UniProtKB/Swiss-Prot annotation:
Localisation: Secreted; Host mitochondrion
Domain notes from UniProt: Contains nine predicted mitochondria targeting signal sequences (MTS), majorly spanning the C-terminal region of the protein. The C-terminal region (amino acids 312-367) is disordered, hydrophobic, contains a eukaryotic-like SH3 (SH3e) domain and shows similarity with the C-terminal region of mitochondria-targeting eukaryotic pro-apoptotic Bcl2-family and BH3-only proteins. This C-terminal region is required for secretion. This region interacts with host TLR4 and NOX components.
UniProt protein name: PPE family protein PPE15
Keywords: Host mitochondrion, Secreted, Virulence
Any coiled-coil regions, as ranges: none
Description of the deletion phenotype: Disruption mutant shows a significant decrease in the biosynthesis and accumulation of lipid droplets containing triacylglycerol and in its tolerance to rifampicin.
GO biological process, one term: response to host immune response
Region (Eukaryotic-like SH3 domain): 312-367
Length: 391
């Protein structure tokens, strides 16, 4: 199309007839917004993949995932740049339109020039309007040239603004057969689960039969070995009255002997258990006798024989008891230091130094007269005889 061949009425009408630069500016803003969103998505995508493969997930699988994701990341980056370029080109087209619109002669001015020319031609008597007609034609020619120049410039600017980067859909980053394989795996798992359920149901239903069939091998063994007939004969023999009476008598007799032996066994056990205390008591008595003999020897050595005397054939009486003559003088010496316990009628002899470390517990002191008692008496009581001196 040659805009110079078109009159200004057409060029001006076309320039003023459109919607203006508004739609192109809106398109440029939309492209810029899309470019910003794609750029943000690409940056987030790259950040997530980098953090995932360098911190949490490392290995051949992560490297394979990175290799599969790289084409999509490259597409996001390229598409964001292409969208931004398209937005800028749209803005450039809008600016070119604004410039062409400003250079174009308004259609009203062109129409007024044509109306003036028609009036001058109609009233041109004797050529008096010829100069005015020539000026009007010259002005119209300028309008023609101006509109043509505006359209040529607008066409050039629009052609440059229309150079956009080609866009393409993203490449496939996953295996196209993955969904089909997943569906097949799910179907196989469902079929396997159904088969397993059927198998479990069959097992549960067959358990009673299997348990009840455990007795069949025993029966078959008895039948194959001929033991079933022998067992039947034995049962018949045991069922006869004579054999049954003999067996019952033997069982009853054995039971009677067992019942009679139980008390005897209990008695023997008790007797065996009581032997230990008796042995302990006998050992204690022997130890007491040995200690008493040692104490008597020490006491005899510690008694001084001075002042003692005896008459041959005579004995000293203690009550109705005949005792050696030495007891009448030796006994007071052993009880001279006796002290009475407060609040009781018992007396305890004071200890005396001597070769004997201690007296045997249970030795009674000499009598102090009617109503006097020695210390507590318990256990074995030895009788100590002092050494007699014959004068």
């Amino acid at each position: 199309m040659d805009f110079g061949a078109l009159p200004p009425e057409i060029n001006s009408a076309r320039m003023y007839a459109g919607a203006g630069a508004g739609p192109m500016m809106a398109a440029g803003a939309a492209w810029n917004g899309l470019a910003a969103e794609l750029g943000t998505t690409a940056a987030s995508y790259e950040s997530v993949i980098t953090r995932l493969t360098t911190e949490s997930w490392m290995g051949p699988a992560s490297m394979a995932m990175v290799a599969a994701a790289q084409p999509y990341l490259a597409w996001l980056t390229y598409t964001a740049e292409a969208a931004a370029h398209a937005g800028s080109q749209a803005m450039a087209s809008a600016a070119a339109y604004e410039a062409a619109y400003a250079m174009t002669v308004p259609p009203e001015v062109v129409a007024a020039n044509r109306a003036l020319l028609a009036a001058l031609v109609a009233t041109n008597v004797l050529g008096i309007n010829t100069p005015a007609i020539m000026a009007t034609e010259a002005l119209y020619a300028e309008m023609w040239a101006q509109d043509a120049l505006a359209m040529y410039g607008y066409a050039a600017a629009s052609g440059a603004a229309g150079m956009l980067q080609p866009l393409s859909p993203p490449s496939q980053t996953t295996n196209p057969g993955g969904l089909a394989a997943q569906s097949a795996a799910v179907g196989s798992a469902a079929a396997t689960a159904a088969v397993n359920q059927v198998s479990v149901a069959d097992l549960i239903s067959s358990l009673p039969n299997a348990v009840s069939g455990l007795a069949s091998p025993v029966t078959s063994v008895l039948d194959s070995t001929g033991l079933s007939g022998i067992i039947a004969d034995i049962d018949a023999l045991l069922a006869t009255p004579f054999v049954a009476n003999i067996i019952n008598s033997a069982v009853n007799t054995a039971a009677w002997y067992v019942n009679a032996a139980i008390p005897t066994a209990i008695f023997l056990a008790n007797a065996l258990n009581s032997g230990a205390p008796v042995a302990i008591a006998e050992g204690a008595i022997e130890a007491a006798e040995g200690a008493a003999s040692a104490a008597a020897a020490g006491l005899a050595d510690s008694v001084t024989p001075a002042g003692l005397g005896a008459s041959l054939g005579e004995a000293t009486l203690v009550g109705r008891l005949s005792v050696p003559a030495a007891w009448s003088t030796a006994a007071p010496a052993t009880t001279a230091g006796a002290t009475a316990l407060e609040g009781s009628g018992w007396t305890v002899a004071a200890e005396e130094a001597g070769p004997v470390t201690g007296m045997m517990p249970g030795m009674a002191s000499a009598a102090k007269g009617t109503g006097a008692y020695a210390g507590p008496r318990y256990g074995f009581k030895p009788t100590v005889m002092p050494k007699q001196v014959v004068v």
